[in-house]
Amino acid sequence: MSGLLPSRLVDNQEIINLVEHHSKGVFQGDLPKMLKTIEKLLNKSGIETRYWLNNDETPMTLMKTAFNSALAQANINKSDIDLLIYASVTRGFIEPANSTFISKALGLNCRNYDAVDACNGWVTAMDIINSKMKAGEIRHAMVVNMEFGMSEGGPGVPQNFTLHSADELDYKFPSLTIGEAATVTILSNESPDNFNFSYINRPDLSDLCTISLPKWELFCNEEDIERNAPTGGQYQFSSYAAALHDEGKSELIKVFYQHKIPVNDIHQIFTHTASPKMMGLVGEFIGANGNLYNIGNKTGNIITASVPFGIADAIEQGKVEKGQFCMGWVASAGMVFSALSFKL
C-alpha cells in the first residue's frame, strides 16, 4: 500500500481567509461573526490542516509515484495485475471510465473500471476484488484512489468558499474540511478469506450529500429536489453536515456491532476522516479508545482515500505490522455505513 499527500499545507486560518476573500462584497449579514462561526465549527470537527496540490504538482504524477511504491512493496510485475478499479469521488470523466486513463498512464492492459460509491468507494472496490479472488477469477488486483477536488473550478472552489448568507453554511461548510490525497492498494489472492464486510444502507438519506450534474432532477425523486435545488446541476459539492452526523452516529455504531468483532480483538480501526472528533466520540461509545487510527486532524477529509491512507501511514509509522487484525470503518453519502475486517 502507498499513500501520498500533495505538498501545499493549508491550515484553518487560511481556510477562513479564503472564505473572507470570496465572500467580501456579496455576504448579506455580519461577515466577521460568520467567520468566527466557521472557526468554531472547524475546531469542533477536529480538523487542523489539510494538503492541497501545489502549482507544480498533478494528481497523475502523485498517483504514479504511489503506484511505483506499492508495486515495489508487492514484489510483483505490473503485468501480473489482472484488475484495476478506480474508486474515487473526484473524477475527470463520466465516459469512459476514469480507470482507462489510469491504466494508460501506468502502461496496463488489464481489465479496468470505476466503482462509484461516494466515500465508501475503497471499501466497495475491496469487496468486489475479494469476491473475484474467492471465485478464483483473478490473482492480483489494484485499487486507485485520487481525491483532488480543491482546484479552482472543481466541486468546491470558489463556490463553496463564497457565502451569500448564513444559511448557505449548512451545506457549504464540509467543503472547508476537504484535503487531497492519492493512494494505491495492491492485493493478492494468497488469502481470499481474509476479508469480511458488513453494511447498512440508508437510501432515504441520499439527498444529504451530493454533487449533481446537469438535468439531475430527472434522475431523483420529487422529494429530493428541494434540498438539492441550491446547487443542482452545477457540479457543486453540497453536504448537510449536521444532519449527516445526527444520522451517522447511531448507524456507525450499529454496523460495528453487526460485524460481530470484539473491539479488544482489533489492533487498529481505520476511519473515514470527515470529522476526527465525531469519530472519536463514536469510538469511545464502542470502547475503542486506544485503537482508533484517525489521521483526519492533519489530512482533512480525504474522502475515499481515508482508510487506505490511514493504513499506509500506520505501516510507515510502525503502528501496525503484518499479521495484525485491523478494521476499516466508514460513514458515506448515500448513506452507506460499512465495516471491514482483515489481517494485514
Where are these regions (language model features)?
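Condensing-enzyme catalytic core mediating Claisen C-C bond formation in acyl metabolism
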Residues: M1-N55, A166-A242, K343-L344
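Flexible, glycine-rich active-site loops centered on histidine and acidic residues
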Residues: E137-I178
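Claisen-condensing/thiolase-fold acyl-transfer catalytic domains that form or cleave C-C bonds
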Residues: K64, T90-G92, F101-E137, H245-K254, ...
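Short beta-strand segments
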Residues: V116, A141-E147, L187, G328-A331
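Acidic-glycine-rich active-site phosphate/pyrophosphate-binding loop
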Residues: T37-K40, F93-G107, S151-H164, N221-R227, ...
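Short, well-ordered amphipathic alpha-helical segments that serve as non-catalytic structural scaffolds
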Residues: K33-K40, E57-A74, L244-K260, F309-A314
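Short glycine-rich phosphate-binding loop at a beta-alpha junction
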Residues: S79-A87, N264-H272
